[in-house]
From Swiss-Prot:
GO terms for biological process: glycine decarboxylation via glycine cleavage system. GO terms for cellular component: cytosol; glycine cleavage complex. The glycine cleavage system is composed of four proteins: P, T, L and H. Gene3D superfamilies: Aminomethyltransferase beta-barrel domains, Aminomethyltransferase fragment, Probable tRNA modification gtpase trme, domain 1. InterPro entries: GCS_T, GCS_T_bac, GCST_C, GCV_T_N, GcvT/YgfZ/DmdA, GcvT/YgfZ_C, TrmE/GcvT_dom1. It comes from the Bacteria. This is Aminomethyltransferase. It comes from Proteus mirabilis (strain HI4320). GO terms for molecular function: aminomethyltransferase activity; transaminase activity. It catalyses: N(6)-[(R)-S(8)-aminomethyldihydrolipoyl]-L-lysyl-[protein] + (6S)-5,6,7,8-tetrahydrofolate = N(6)-[(R)-dihydrolipoyl]-L-lysyl-[protein] + (6R)-5,10-methylene-5,6,7,8-tetrahydrofolate + NH4(+). Its EC number is 2.1.2.10.
């Protein structure tokens, strides 16, 4: 039976259509996915992301452990609360999960991992922690709400005390801070400003209602997906998985190659892949009518006149732009145009860098 977050009854009360999402009953939408999408781009929306897993790691060797476990290097994190995005890889360089890690001090870090990969993530972390003095604490006592949009920060700050408001208002992107019972982070998955806020489960309903009272509207999984795709952000299981390495998923920037003597899981395989070359992830824009969908073939001719083929990993109609966009994995050598096979028709598409909308503004 699918699990419920502490906010399940609130979703139902708001008229949500509930669906099973990787073993969790979650809101797909509250009546109109497109309205929810526009509300996040233009005002402020909130998502229940309590199905995600927060893992706190404590101990004298936790920094060394994470420098081995993750492709990005936590040694970069020297300011309290600073976060980074990284892949957690297998020995062949495939992505076990993508996650965010927060630094509190040399003996305390926090990971936020995906719900779909929870069990394998925890098993992987536990297995590799055996050689280190590390205490693993899964924070199932916490709920998590993401508040996103151009007015999200102002509306959240209305709910804070004056002293906390000053702290939060001064935060840069990709930081987290503990404010009594609330953990407030300047992170998100929409391409908009906002916060991801963790709190004790028993406080989630009250906080949700307070957000509603200051004009933050709920948004479901449907809008979350179109927003992240407009922002050019990867989704685990679509853009990457255990058979896909970061270089093929537009995650090359999350690999810390330096210092050269840092050994992390998957490094040897990645160095070979970097030397031989890999496919790459690109953005596609289709201004004709129709919708680009995952699984569709992408064709182009390379400099040698050879016909090459890739595949769409995620595609949708963009509510902000008014036409279809997609992410696609293709062989290197693609230029600024390609052909997509759509219902037995060859449709021309533009090839762009991943990322179509940021902070409400079109990038294409």
């Amino acid at each position: 039976m699918a699990k419920q977050t502490p906010l399940y009854d609130e979703h139902v009360a708001c008229g949500a259509r509930m669906v099973d999402f990787h073993g969790w009953m979650m809101p797909l939408h509250y009546g109109s996915q497109i309205d929810e999408h526009h509300n996040v781009r233009q005002d402020a929306g909130m998502f229940d992301v309590s199905h995600m897993t927060i893992v706190d790691l404590h101990g004298p060797q936790v920094k060394d452990f994470l420098r081995y476990l993750l492709a990005n290097d936590v040694a970069k994190l020297t300011e309290k609360g600073k976060a980074l995005y990284t892949g957690m890889l297998n020995a062949s360089g495939g992505v076990i999960d993508d996650l965010i890690v927060y630094y509190f001090d040399e003996t305390f870090y926090r990971l936020v991992v995906n719900s779909a990969t929870r069990e394998k993530d925890l098993a992987w972390i536990t297995e590799h922690a055996k050689d280190y003095v590390v205490d693993i604490q899964v924070r199932d006592d916490l709920a998590l709400i993401a508040v996103q949009g151009p007015h999200a920060q102002e509306k959240v700050q209305r709910l804070l005390s004056e002293s906390h408001r000053q702290i939060v208002a001064a935060m840069k992107p990709f930081y987290g801070v503990q404010l009594d019972d609330l953990f407030v982070a300047t992170t998100g998955y929409t391409g908009e400003a906002g916060y991801e806020i963790a709190m004790p489960k028993e406080q989630a309903v009250d906080y949700w209602k307070k957000l509603l009272a200051v004009g933050v509207k709920p948004a479901g999984l449907g809008a979350r997906d179109t927003l992240r795709l407009e922002a050019g952000m990867d989704l685990y299981g679509q853009e990457m998985d255990e058979t896909i390495n970061p270089l093929e998923a537009n995650m090359g920037w999350t690999i810390a190659w330096l210092p050269e003597d840092r050994q992390f899981i998957g490094r040897e395989a990645l160095e070979k892949l970097r030397a031989t070359g890999t496919d790459k992830l690109v953005g596609l824009v289709m201004r004709e009518k129709g919708v680009l969908r995952a699984g569709s073939a992408v064709h182009f001719t390379d400099d040698l006149g050879e016909l090459r083929e890739g595949v769409i990993t995620s595609g949708t109609f963009s509510p902000t732009l008014g036409f279809s966009i997609a992410l696609a994995r293709v062989p290197a050598g693609i230029k600024d145009s390609a052909i997509v096979l759509l219902r037995n028709r060859e449709i021309p598409v533009e090839v762009v860098k991943p990322g179509f909308v940021r902070s409400g503004k079109a990038l294409v």
